[in-house]
UniProtKB/Swiss-Prot annotation:
Protein name, UniProt field: FMN reductase (NADH) RutF
Function field: Catalyzes the reduction of FMN to FMNH2 which is used to reduce pyrimidine by RutA via the Rut pathway.
Matches recorded under InterPro entries: Flavin_Rdtase-like_dom, NADH-dep_flavin_reductase, RutF, Split_barrel_FMN-bd
GO molecular function: FMN binding; FMN reductase (NADH) activity; FMN reductase [NAD(P)H] activity; riboflavin reductase (NADPH) activity
HAMAP family: RutF
Pfam families, alphabetized: Flavin_Reduct
């Protein structure tokens, strides 16, 4: 099938499952956070993630001024928090909906996250409508009971560790 429009691309990408993340930052430009599924590992030497952020997003000006962020991968049952950070809700309301700690980079770290990656942004690359942030991981916090949350086919799905 030849790709002819962005709707076809988006429909195809809906069939690719992804972890659900809340990306947070804090610093001179303020505190901000957004929901993202366009996050993945790049390499383990040095430990690096990439985060994609639309330059038209309301949080873009804040993230563009900061050099650190925290990738908070959501656990099962945190769908409402994902929706809150994915909408037009005021930042104070978003952060008031959960318990946060200050991570190693000074960014908000979600206490109940499946895993949190505190990162230093090492590089930014603009592609189309988005900035790709290459993030060096400086600290990791893991939840003791892994129950994942995935975004697949435009909906949330829970992942559980097999009993065997």
């Amino acid at each position: 099938m030849e790709l002819t429009d962005k709707a076809s691309f988006r429909d195809a990408m809906a069939h690719v499952g992804a972890a659900v993340n809340i990306i947070t930052t804090d610093g001179p430009a303020g505190r901000a956070g957004f929901t993202a599924s366009a996050v993945c590992s790049v390499t383990d030497t040095p430990p690096t993630l990439l985060v994609c952020l639309n330059r038209s997003a309301s949080v873009w000006p804040v993230f563009s001024e900061h050099h650190t962020l925290c990738v908070n991968t959501l656990a099962a049952g945190q769908e409402a928090l994902s929706t809150l950070f994915g909408g037009k809700t005021a930042m104070d309301e978003r952060f008031a909906a959960a318990d946060w700690q200050t991570g190693a980079t000074g960014c908000p770290r979600l206490e109940a996250a499946l895993v949190s990656f505190d990162c230093r942004i090492d590089q930014r690359v603009s592609v189309g409508t988005h900035d790709i942030l290459f993030c060096h991981v400086v600290a990791i916090t893991r939840h003791p009971e892994p129950r994942g949350l995935m975004w697949f086919d435009r909906g949330y799905h829970t992942l559980m560790r097999p009993a065997c």
